[in-house]
């Protein structure tokens, strides 16, 4: 069932929360780097009033639990509860048994590690249907109803919190490196969310479509879809070819097209995740190793 609560998902949400918490304690807090979203607010409260993030994280997220229940349903509520409680638990553990690794002399490295750990942790949590509460839920709702990647929504919200942190306890240098960490995290979240199997999509318009598609099929063993179109100026019906290939085959695809029709119109676009035969399945419909 789509809405079934799975132990596998809960397990990976716990793993993601542990990775996130480790990065936050050992790279953000130790090097006075802020963070965005509700996590950034917990760090702000810690810097100004010495309130433990493990406690303020739970307190701030109580209202969000009700939003999660009403708008995201029972399964999302459970995963959000697990993610939020696990985050606070791991924050408490890592603060209690902290490994001292200060990198104030190299904030660029600290920001990179902070972004990687937080991005990887949140990416895993999101991929398995969970959130850590707060802006994570807002980002998931925006992604669900408007199709905007979660990383972008979070980056915008994060910027607002970081500006507030700059006005209260961050230096300009720390604020700039915090933005670097947030950017790295946002990119990594999108990468993990989209599956990591990126490809290129080519839209081809040519008077020699038959020869082009035949050569693609024979030499590259890639499928080609024929779309129906109409020229804006001539009003003539035309066939438009669409082909998706791995990034490392794009040069070969261009070479095939150019060898038949150097004047062909070719538009190449990014394809963030590809499923199906030739990419995630072999010719016998068995999963390919990724």
Curated annotation (Swiss-Prot):
Annotated transmembrane regions: 9-29, 47-67, 75-95, 106-126, 146-166, 179-199
Localization: Cell membrane
Entry keyword annotation includes Membrane: yes
Major localization class: membrane
Key word Ribonucleoprotein present: no
Topological type in the membrane: Multi-pass membrane protein
InterPro entries listed in its UniProt record: DUF2179 (IPR019264), N-reg_PII/ATP_PRibTrfase_C (IPR015867), UPF0750_membrane (IPR051461), YitT (IPR003740)
Domain of life: Bacteria
Keywords in alphabetical order: Cell membrane, Membrane, Transmembrane, Transmembrane helix
Any one GO cellular component localisation term in the record: plasma membrane
Family stated for the protein in its record: Belongs to the UPF0750 family.
Protein name: UPF0750 membrane protein YpjC
Upper lineage: Bacteria, Bacillati, Bacillota, Bacilli, Bacillales
